[in-house]
Amino acid sequence: MSKIYSLVDKFLMSDFSEIIIQNLNKKTYENLIIFDIGCYRGNFSRNLKNKLKINNNNFYLFDANKNLDIPDFNYYNLAISNKKEIKNFYLNDFFPSSGSSLNTLVKDDKLWNFTRKLLTFNFKKKFSLHKVQSDTLDNICNSKDIKEIDILKIDVEGAELDILLGAESILHNVSIIQLEILDSKDNFDKKYSNICDLLKKKYDFKILLKKEILSLGFFSSLKAYDVIFTKIRIS
């Protein structure tokens, strides 16, 4: 499974690190604060760290998957959502990096599950239910006295809106967001519009780049985009 994940990460996942770095509004990088929500093994953060040449302590990584261990970063086995409570987390046991979420969109898509099991040659395993602790981004930042976030990456397989709703305060002080927006093909346009309107109108973000994740839509009823948002700067 590790080899399959490495291939998927290398050839199917987009790397936006260069455009993110180019749009950082800071002269030096040593005091950057980077949040990686839905980090899985931490490759997004590790890639940024290597390019920015900064300390591991600049990073805060979160994932609800209890099987992960990321010793080289500040890693928290915690789900980020809109409330502090116990929630259901659905772990994809046949390919944990894809579809594991508080949301059931991927779990419930029969065609996605069948075709991805074909790709992984793993027909016996499925999604398993786990009770996990969740908290809000605002609560986390308050508890750690974090006043601003330079880079916020969110990849949570359909549960992204709840994270934004639990970040009402800190979003005013976030510079760049890399956000995966995922939903069914029938409902995607509505969700995409709602999230973009929220970030543009309430928090003064603009879309810097968007790219459809084509591999997700093949043989499934799902659709997703990776979107880079940056704050509108008044010169």
Place the predicted regions along the sequence by residue.
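Phosphate/nucleotide-binding beta-alpha loop and adjacent structural elements of enzyme active sites
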Residues: 1-235
